Amino acid sequence: MPPSLNPYQKAKIRVTEKRSELQKFFYAAGDLVAFAGRFFRDVLKPPYEWREILYQCFLVGYKSTFLIGLTGFIMGAVLTIQTRPSMAQFGAISMIPGMISVSVVREIGPVITALICCGKIGSRMGAELGSMKVTEQIDAMEVSAINPFRYLVVTRTLATILMVPLLTIYSDLIALFGGYLAMNIHDTSTLRHFFVAAMSHLEFIDVFPAIIKTFFFGFVVGLIGCYKGWNARRGTESVGMAANSAVVASSLAVFVIDMLAAQITDLLV
Protein backbone atom coordinates (compact mmCIF):
# COMPACT_ATOMS: atom_id res chain seq x y z
CA MET A 1 0.00 0.00 0.00
CA PRO A 2 1.30 3.50 -0.79
CA PRO A 3 2.29 5.54 2.25
CA SER A 4 -0.29 8.00 3.52
CA LEU A 5 0.38 11.66 2.89
CA ASN A 6 0.69 14.14 5.69
CA PRO A 7 -1.43 17.34 5.65
CA TYR A 8 1.46 19.39 4.27
CA GLN A 9 1.92 17.06 1.29
CA LYS A 10 -1.83 17.04 0.59
CA ALA A 11 -1.95 20.84 0.68
CA LYS A 12 1.05 21.01 -1.65
CA ILE A 13 -0.68 18.74 -4.17
CA ARG A 14 -3.83 20.87 -4.06
CA VAL A 15 -1.84 24.06 -4.58
CA THR A 16 -0.02 22.48 -7.53
CA GLU A 17 -3.33 21.41 -9.10
CA LYS A 18 -4.84 24.87 -8.63
CA ARG A 19 -1.75 26.49 -10.11
CA SER A 20 -1.98 24.21 -13.13
CA GLU A 21 -5.64 25.15 -13.62
CA LEU A 22 -4.78 28.84 -13.31
CA GLN A 23 -2.01 28.48 -15.87
CA LYS A 24 -4.43 26.78 -18.28
CA PHE A 25 -6.93 29.60 -17.78
CA PHE A 26 -4.42 32.35 -18.57
CA TYR A 27 -3.09 30.38 -21.52
CA ALA A 28 -6.60 30.00 -22.93
CA ALA A 29 -7.33 33.70 -22.32
CA GLY A 30 -4.16 34.70 -24.16
CA ASP A 31 -4.95 32.32 -27.00
CA LEU A 32 -8.45 33.80 -27.27
CA VAL A 33 -6.98 37.32 -27.45
CA ALA A 34 -4.68 36.18 -30.27
CA PHE A 35 -7.69 34.58 -31.98
CA ALA A 36 -9.56 37.89 -31.70
CA GLY A 37 -6.54 39.72 -33.10
CA ARG A 38 -6.53 37.43 -36.10
CA PHE A 39 -10.24 38.15 -36.58
CA PHE A 40 -9.70 41.93 -36.61
CA ARG A 41 -6.80 41.50 -39.02
CA ASP A 42 -8.83 39.44 -41.49
CA VAL A 43 -12.09 41.37 -41.15
CA LEU A 44 -10.42 44.52 -42.47
CA LYS A 45 -9.12 42.81 -45.60
CA PRO A 46 -11.45 42.58 -48.60
CA PRO A 47 -12.82 40.69 -50.44
CA TYR A 48 -15.59 39.48 -48.15
CA GLU A 49 -17.61 36.29 -48.33
CA TRP A 50 -20.93 38.11 -48.71
CA ARG A 51 -22.92 35.02 -49.63
CA GLU A 52 -21.75 33.17 -46.53
CA ILE A 53 -22.25 36.24 -44.32
CA LEU A 54 -25.86 36.58 -45.50
CA TYR A 55 -26.45 32.87 -44.99
CA GLN A 56 -25.09 33.05 -41.44
CA CYS A 57 -27.25 36.12 -40.78
CA PHE A 58 -30.23 34.04 -41.89
CA LEU A 59 -29.28 31.24 -39.50
CA VAL A 60 -28.52 33.56 -36.59
CA GLY A 61 -31.37 36.01 -37.10
CA TYR A 62 -34.37 34.53 -38.87
CA LYS A 63 -33.99 31.06 -37.39
CA SER A 64 -33.97 32.56 -33.88
CA THR A 65 -36.99 34.85 -34.18
CA PHE A 66 -39.53 32.36 -32.81
CA LEU A 67 -37.51 31.46 -29.71
CA ILE A 68 -36.49 35.06 -29.05
CA GLY A 69 -40.04 36.30 -29.60
CA LEU A 70 -41.60 33.67 -27.34
CA THR A 71 -39.07 34.37 -24.59
CA GLY A 72 -39.59 38.12 -24.90
CA PHE A 73 -43.37 37.77 -24.76
CA ILE A 74 -43.23 35.63 -21.62
CA MET A 75 -40.66 37.96 -20.08
CA GLY A 76 -42.85 41.04 -20.56
CA ALA A 77 -46.03 39.28 -19.40
CA VAL A 78 -44.44 37.82 -16.26
CA LEU A 79 -42.80 41.12 -15.38
CA THR A 80 -46.16 42.88 -15.59
CA ILE A 81 -48.05 40.21 -13.65
CA GLN A 82 -45.47 40.11 -10.86
CA THR A 83 -45.15 43.86 -10.40
CA ARG A 84 -48.79 44.91 -10.77
CA PRO A 85 -49.89 44.04 -7.19
CA SER A 86 -47.09 46.11 -5.66
CA MET A 87 -47.76 49.04 -7.98
CA ALA A 88 -51.51 48.84 -7.26
CA GLN A 89 -50.89 49.26 -3.52
CA PHE A 90 -49.37 52.66 -4.20
CA GLY A 91 -51.91 53.64 -6.85
CA ALA A 92 -49.20 53.63 -9.51
CA ILE A 93 -50.81 51.42 -12.15
CA SER A 94 -50.11 54.09 -14.76
CA MET A 95 -46.37 53.69 -14.09
CA ILE A 96 -46.30 50.03 -15.14
CA PRO A 97 -45.64 50.67 -18.88
CA GLY A 98 -42.71 52.95 -18.08
CA MET A 99 -41.27 50.54 -15.55
CA ILE A 100 -41.49 47.65 -18.00
CA SER A 101 -39.93 49.63 -20.85
CA VAL A 102 -36.97 50.82 -18.79
CA SER A 103 -36.36 47.39 -17.24
CA VAL A 104 -36.60 45.53 -20.53
CA VAL A 105 -34.69 47.97 -22.72
CA ARG A 106 -31.86 48.72 -20.33
CA GLU A 107 -31.11 45.31 -18.89
CA ILE A 108 -33.43 42.34 -19.18
CA GLY A 109 -33.94 42.34 -22.95
CA PRO A 110 -30.29 42.55 -24.03
CA VAL A 111 -29.03 40.04 -21.46
CA ILE A 112 -31.76 37.44 -21.98
CA THR A 113 -31.41 37.70 -25.76
CA ALA A 114 -27.63 37.31 -25.52
CA LEU A 115 -27.94 34.28 -23.23
CA ILE A 116 -30.37 32.61 -25.63
CA CYS A 117 -27.91 33.27 -28.44
CA CYS A 118 -25.15 31.72 -26.32
CA GLY A 119 -27.14 28.53 -25.96
CA LYS A 120 -28.55 28.34 -29.47
CA ILE A 121 -25.97 30.01 -31.69
CA GLY A 122 -22.73 29.68 -29.73
CA SER A 123 -23.24 25.95 -29.20
CA ARG A 124 -24.09 25.44 -32.87
CA MET A 125 -20.95 27.23 -34.01
CA GLY A 126 -18.79 25.33 -31.54
CA ALA A 127 -20.22 21.98 -32.60
CA GLU A 128 -20.13 22.83 -36.31
CA LEU A 129 -16.53 23.98 -36.40
CA GLY A 130 -15.50 21.26 -33.96
CA SER A 131 -16.98 18.63 -36.26
CA MET A 132 -15.16 20.16 -39.22
CA LYS A 133 -11.92 20.14 -37.25
CA VAL A 134 -12.32 16.51 -36.19
CA THR A 135 -13.15 15.35 -39.72
CA GLU A 136 -10.22 17.40 -41.11
CA GLN A 137 -12.45 19.54 -43.34
CA ILE A 138 -10.61 22.67 -42.18
CA ASP A 139 -7.30 21.13 -43.24
CA ALA A 140 -8.81 20.28 -46.62
CA MET A 141 -9.89 23.91 -47.08
CA GLU A 142 -6.34 25.08 -46.43
CA VAL A 143 -5.00 22.66 -49.03
CA SER A 144 -7.55 23.90 -51.59
CA ALA A 145 -6.26 27.50 -51.25
CA ILE A 146 -9.34 28.69 -49.30
CA ASN A 147 -8.74 30.75 -46.18
CA PRO A 148 -10.78 28.73 -43.65
CA PHE A 149 -10.49 31.36 -40.93
CA ARG A 150 -11.98 34.05 -43.14
CA TYR A 151 -14.69 31.75 -44.52
CA LEU A 152 -15.69 30.08 -41.24
CA VAL A 153 -14.82 32.41 -38.37
CA VAL A 154 -15.06 35.93 -39.82
CA THR A 155 -18.41 35.31 -41.49
CA ARG A 156 -20.02 33.76 -38.41
CA THR A 157 -18.73 36.40 -36.03
CA LEU A 158 -19.85 39.23 -38.30
CA ALA A 159 -23.29 37.64 -38.50
CA THR A 160 -23.67 37.56 -34.72
CA ILE A 161 -22.39 41.13 -34.39
CA LEU A 162 -25.03 42.31 -36.87
CA MET A 163 -27.97 40.17 -35.80
CA VAL A 164 -27.85 40.15 -31.98
CA PRO A 165 -28.71 43.90 -31.78
CA LEU A 166 -31.63 43.38 -34.18
CA LEU A 167 -32.84 40.38 -32.19
CA THR A 168 -32.63 42.46 -29.02
CA ILE A 169 -34.80 45.23 -30.48
CA TYR A 170 -37.27 42.59 -31.68
CA SER A 171 -37.31 40.98 -28.23
CA ASP A 172 -37.89 44.34 -26.53
CA LEU A 173 -40.90 45.12 -28.72
CA ILE A 174 -42.42 41.68 -28.19
CA ALA A 175 -41.82 42.00 -24.44
CA LEU A 176 -43.70 45.30 -24.37
CA PHE A 177 -46.56 43.71 -26.30
CA GLY A 178 -46.63 40.85 -23.81
CA GLY A 179 -46.72 43.36 -20.98
CA TYR A 180 -49.61 45.15 -22.67
CA LEU A 181 -51.67 41.96 -22.94
CA ALA A 182 -50.89 40.99 -19.34
CA MET A 183 -51.87 44.44 -18.11
CA ASN A 184 -55.22 44.17 -19.88
CA ILE A 185 -56.14 41.13 -17.79
CA HIS A 186 -57.12 43.47 -14.94
CA ASP A 187 -57.04 46.92 -16.54
CA THR A 188 -58.23 48.39 -19.80
CA SER A 189 -55.68 50.17 -21.95
CA THR A 190 -55.29 50.69 -25.66
CA LEU A 191 -52.14 49.53 -27.40
CA ARG A 192 -51.34 53.08 -28.47
CA HIS A 193 -51.74 54.47 -24.96
CA PHE A 194 -49.57 51.69 -23.50
CA PHE A 195 -46.72 52.21 -25.96
CA VAL A 196 -46.86 56.00 -25.65
CA ALA A 197 -46.62 55.69 -21.87
CA ALA A 198 -43.79 53.17 -22.20
CA MET A 199 -41.75 55.26 -24.64
CA SER A 200 -42.25 58.48 -22.68
CA HIS A 201 -40.15 57.07 -19.84
CA LEU A 202 -37.24 56.07 -22.07
CA GLU A 203 -34.34 58.46 -22.49
CA PHE A 204 -31.28 58.45 -24.70
CA ILE A 205 -29.10 57.21 -21.85
CA ASP A 206 -31.41 54.20 -21.52
CA VAL A 207 -31.45 53.15 -25.16
CA PHE A 208 -28.00 54.00 -26.53
CA PRO A 209 -25.82 52.03 -24.05
CA ALA A 210 -28.21 49.09 -24.27
CA ILE A 211 -27.86 48.92 -28.06
CA ILE A 212 -24.09 49.43 -28.00
CA LYS A 213 -23.46 46.58 -25.59
CA THR A 214 -25.46 44.18 -27.76
CA PHE A 215 -22.80 44.53 -30.46
CA PHE A 216 -20.23 43.36 -27.91
CA PHE A 217 -22.57 40.54 -26.87
CA GLY A 218 -22.79 39.42 -30.47
CA PHE A 219 -19.02 39.64 -30.83
CA VAL A 220 -18.25 37.39 -27.86
CA VAL A 221 -21.00 34.90 -28.75
CA GLY A 222 -19.66 34.42 -32.27
CA LEU A 223 -15.96 34.65 -31.47
CA ILE A 224 -15.99 32.30 -28.48
CA GLY A 225 -18.22 29.79 -30.26
CA CYS A 226 -15.87 29.74 -33.24
CA TYR A 227 -12.78 29.66 -31.00
CA LYS A 228 -13.96 26.61 -29.10
CA GLY A 229 -14.82 24.76 -32.29
CA TRP A 230 -11.65 25.85 -34.08
CA ASN A 231 -9.47 24.50 -31.25
CA ALA A 232 -11.36 21.24 -30.74
CA ARG A 233 -9.14 18.23 -30.26
CA ARG A 234 -9.23 15.12 -32.37
CA GLY A 235 -11.99 12.76 -31.34
CA THR A 236 -15.77 12.75 -31.50
CA GLU A 237 -16.32 13.62 -27.84
CA SER A 238 -14.42 16.87 -28.32
CA VAL A 239 -17.30 18.16 -30.47
CA GLY A 240 -19.68 18.01 -27.53
CA MET A 241 -17.05 19.51 -25.25
CA ALA A 242 -16.53 22.39 -27.69
CA ALA A 243 -20.27 23.13 -27.80
CA ASN A 244 -20.61 22.95 -24.02
CA SER A 245 -17.58 25.12 -23.28
CA ALA A 246 -18.73 27.65 -25.89
CA VAL A 247 -22.02 28.14 -24.04
CA VAL A 248 -20.36 28.43 -20.63
CA ALA A 249 -17.57 30.79 -21.70
CA SER A 250 -19.77 33.07 -23.83
CA SER A 251 -22.44 33.29 -21.10
CA LEU A 252 -19.79 34.31 -18.58
CA ALA A 253 -18.42 36.88 -21.05
CA VAL A 254 -21.92 38.33 -21.51
CA PHE A 255 -22.30 38.89 -17.76
CA VAL A 256 -18.84 40.47 -17.50
CA ILE A 257 -19.55 42.84 -20.40
CA ASP A 258 -22.94 43.70 -18.93
CA MET A 259 -21.36 44.54 -15.58
CA LEU A 260 -18.72 46.74 -17.24
CA ALA A 261 -21.37 48.46 -19.37
CA ALA A 262 -23.45 49.19 -16.27
CA GLN A 263 -20.45 50.72 -14.51
CA ILE A 264 -19.48 52.84 -17.50
CA THR A 265 -23.06 54.04 -17.98
CA ASP A 266 -23.29 54.94 -14.30
CA LEU A 267 -20.11 57.03 -14.58
CA LEU A 268 -21.40 58.88 -17.64
CA VAL A 269 -24.77 59.79 -16.16
Please give the residue ranges for each predicted region.
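Membrane-interfacial helix-loop-helix connectors in multipass membrane proteins
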Residues: 82-105, 173-215, 219, 223-243, ...
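Membrane-helix cytosolic exit motif
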Residues: 229, 248, 252, 256-269
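Short cytoplasmic-facing helical segments at TM-TM junctions of multi-pass membrane proteins
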Residues: 129-154, 236-239
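Selective transmembrane-helix segments that form parts of the transport pathway or gating/packing helices
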Residues: 61, 65, 69, 108, ...
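Hydrophobic alpha-helical transmembrane segments that constitute the membrane-spanning cores
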Residues: 71-74, 114, 154-183, 216, ...
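Active-site cofactor/substrate anionic-group-binding motifs, chiefly glycine-
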Residues: 58-112, 116
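Short, membrane-interfacial amphipathic segments enriched in basic
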Residues: 7-52, 228-229, 233
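Hydrophobic alpha-helical transmembrane segments of multi-pass membrane transport proteins
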Residues: 96-139, 167, 224
